[in-house]
Amino acid sequence: MDYEFLRDVTGVVKVRMSMGHEVIGHWFNEEVKENLALLDEVEDAARTLKGSERSWQRAGHEYTLWMDGEEVMVRANQLEFAGDEMEEGMNYYDEESLSLCGVEDFLQVVAAYRNFVQQK
């Protein structure tokens, strides 16, 4: 999972993620927006979940982050899982609205994002 942090002309941090993980970048850009307290909450939840069967989720305005002891899922809130009813052409839409990754990989991005934000 590759990522890049940039600052736009106004100084706002933007995250770009590799293909298949774009939604994670959107979560940082739309939900985190340099709010390090939210990252603290996510890291605390990850520590609590490690080695357990429990899960945790944080619904935001545009995206929801869901996590268990092994995996992180970020999905667009407007994405409805219709199961077998999903049309064949909807896979591309689904990839633009849902990303999965391991907890450790996600926490590495969180730590790198925090470091980048603090380098003002």
Curated annotation (Swiss-Prot):
It comes from the Bacteria. Transmembrane segments: none annotated. It holds the Pfam family UPF0231. InterPro entries: UPF0231 (IPR008249). HAMAP family: UPF0231 (MF_01053). Belongs to the UPF0231 family. This is UPF0231 protein YacL. It comes from Escherichia coli (strain SMS-3-5 / SECEC). The lineage of its organism: Bacteria, Pseudomonadati, Pseudomonadota, Gammaproteobacteria, Enterobacterales. The gene is yacL.
